[in-house]
C-alpha cells in the first residue's frame, strides 16, 4: 500500500530503474483515504479477519480509518513521533466521548466509536538497528 504521494514517487522511480512485471488481476484498485493520506488496495483483498500494519501515521490517519470502514479489518498503526501520538490520542479520546475531532491542520474526522476501537496504536518504528531514537 502506498501511503502518500512521496511513497508513490519512490515506487515509480524504483519501477523505472528496476522494472517489474505485474500480473493483472480481476480486481480493481481502490483508493482509500484523502489526497494526502491514502492507500491503494485491490478490491476484495481484505476482510474482517485481516490485520493491516501501517507505519508512519503522522497527523493524518484517514486512510487507516477508511480501511476499517471499508473492510471492517483491524489496523495496527506504528509511529513513535510525539505529534503523531498526540494526534491519535486526541482523536481517540474525543471519539470515545462522542465528539468530532478537528485537528490543527483543519482536517475533520467522522469516525465512530466502533471504528476507532478497531485501530491499535503502537509507539514503535522500523529502523536499521535495535536502538532508541529521540524525536
Where are the model-predicted features located?
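Phosphate/nucleotide-binding beta-alpha loop and adjacent structural elements of enzyme active sites
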Residues: 1-135
Amino acid at each position: 500500500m502506498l501511503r502518500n504521494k512521496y511513497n508513490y514517487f519512490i515506487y515509480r522511480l524504483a519501477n523505472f530503474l528496476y522494472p517489474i512485471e505485474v500480473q493483472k488481476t480481476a480486481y480493481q484498485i481502490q483508493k482509500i483515504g484523502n489526497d494526502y493520506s491514502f492507500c491503494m488496495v485491490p478490491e476484495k483483498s481484505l476482510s474482517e479477519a485481516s490485520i493491516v500494519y501501517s507505519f508512519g501515521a503522522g497527523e493524518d490517519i484517514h486512510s487507516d480509518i477508511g480501511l476499517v470502514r471499508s473492510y471492517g479489518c483491524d489496523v495496527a498503526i506504528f509511529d513513535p513521533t510525539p505529534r503523531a501520538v498526540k494526534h491519535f490520542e486526541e482523536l481517540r479520546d474525543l471519539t470515545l466521548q462522542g465528539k468530532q475531532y478537528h485537528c490543527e491542520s483543519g482536517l475533520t474526522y467522522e469516525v465512530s466509536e466502533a471504528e476507532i476501537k478497531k485501530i491499535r496504536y503502537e509507539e514503535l518504528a522500523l529502523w536499521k538497528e535495535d536502538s532508541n531514537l529521540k524525536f
